[in-house]
Regions:
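Histidine/acidic residue-rich metal-binding segments in metalloenzymes
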Residues: 127-129, 133, 173
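Short glycine/proline- and charge-enriched loop/turn segments
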Residues: 46-52, 150-152, 220
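Solvent-exposed loop/turn segments at secondary-structure junctions
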Residues: 10, 84-86, 117-119, 149-150, ...
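Histidine-acidic metal/acid-base catalytic patches
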Residues: 1-29, 36-40, 65, 72, ...
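Structural motif corresponding to the early beta-alpha repeats
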Residues: 28-126, 136-141, 247, 255-257
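Aromatic-lined carbohydrate-recognition surfaces of secreted/lumenal glycan-active proteins
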Residues: 143-152, 184
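Active-site cleft segment of glycoside hydrolase catalytic domains centered on the general acid/base Glu
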Residues: 118-128, 154-161
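Short glycine-enriched, charge-decorated loop/helix-capping segments at active-site entrances
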Residues: 48-57, 157-158, 224-228
Length: 287
């Protein structure tokens, strides 16, 4: 089982180029191309923030190629990417094809694009069907992901697109295309109030499940912490992945684990992330 991790949390400390290099040096097999800097928005107004980054400039493909080369020079590949979100913001929607382009240019085979939390499977299909021909031209699969909302009165998560196994599968079946697959966010699936558990979702999704966002939580909040640090049952989760013969990467999205790290010690944190991913991979291989 090959392992990967998102690079956004590392890049916030040392930049994207160095982040890819550190992933390789820590022992990951691959890197997950975080494309959020392509378009950052004000979550209140849904309007774009003015911020300069290679991903939102004219030479975005050149930047993607440079990251790919850094990875290859250090022995790792890009396995997948994460498009900017939320997709209900027009500014974000305008960059989704660019996200697919960058994924292909970096060598990734899957681009995770969130559904609109508030829309049905049929409504979200309109966006995905618009993007699929472009994705196919670039040899990139689109993966949708299980989401959540927050109920302030109950102080817990609440239903959103793909939050349950049944709604997730419906999103896939409405489109019914081999280039449209599932990325299961294990942490989201375990949040109280919205999902119905990672194990149930894994078994329901079956062969549709081709990508993962792996992180840890207290089974209440979306903590995005390092695996084995909180309350999730990874033994049961890995067993379920083995049962469906999961063939994708084990990709971490423990994006808050490095919050307290600095440029001086971030590599130590990346190594700890790699160690947690290796433990999960070993558990899978030894089932």
């Amino acid at each position: 089982m090959k392992i990967s991790t998102e690079i956004d949390s590392i890049a916030k400390i040392v930049g994207m180029e160095k982040a890819v290099e550190l992933c390789a040096k820590a022992g990951f097999d691959a890197w997950d191309f975080s494309l959020f800097d392509m378009c950052l928005i004000d979550w209140g107004t849904r309007l774009p923030l003015q911020r300069q980054h290679p991903l939102n400039g004219p030479h975005y493909l050149k930047f993607a190629r440079e990251l790919k080369k850094i990875g290859l020079d250090n022995g790792i590949v890009c396995n997948q990417s994460h498009a900017p979100f939320p997709v209900d913001a027009p500014a974000i929607r305008a960059f989704l094809k660019r996200a697919i382009e960058c994924t292909a240019e970096a060598g990734g085979s899957i681009c995770i694009i969130h559904p609109d939390n508030a829309k049905t499977a049929e409504e979200n299909a309109e966006m995905y069907l618009e993007l699929l021909p472009f994705a196919k031209e670039h040899g990139v699969k689109i993966a949708t992901e299980n989401m959540w909302n927050w109920d302030g009165e109950k102080d817990e998560s609440s239903f959103a697109a793909c939050a349950t196994a049944e709604d997730f599968k419906k999103h896939l079946e409405v489109i019914d295309d081999e280039f449209f697959v599932a990325c299961l966010d294990l942490g989201h699936a375990e949040m109280r109030g919205s999902g119905n558990g990672a194990v149930h979702m894994i078994k329901t999704l079956g062969h549709h499940l081709q990508a993962l966002h792996i992180h840890e939580n207290d089974r209440w909040h979306d903590n995005h912490q390092i695996p084995f640090s909180m309350d999730m049952d990874f033994d049961a989760i890995v067993k379920a992945l083995k049962e469906i013969d999961y063939k994708g990467y084990f990709t971490l999205e423990a994006c808050h684990f490095l919050d307290g790290y600095t440029e001086a010690n971030v590599f130590e944190g990346v190594v700890k992330l790699r160690e947690s991913a290796t433990k999960l991979a070993d558990m899978f291989e030894n089932q």
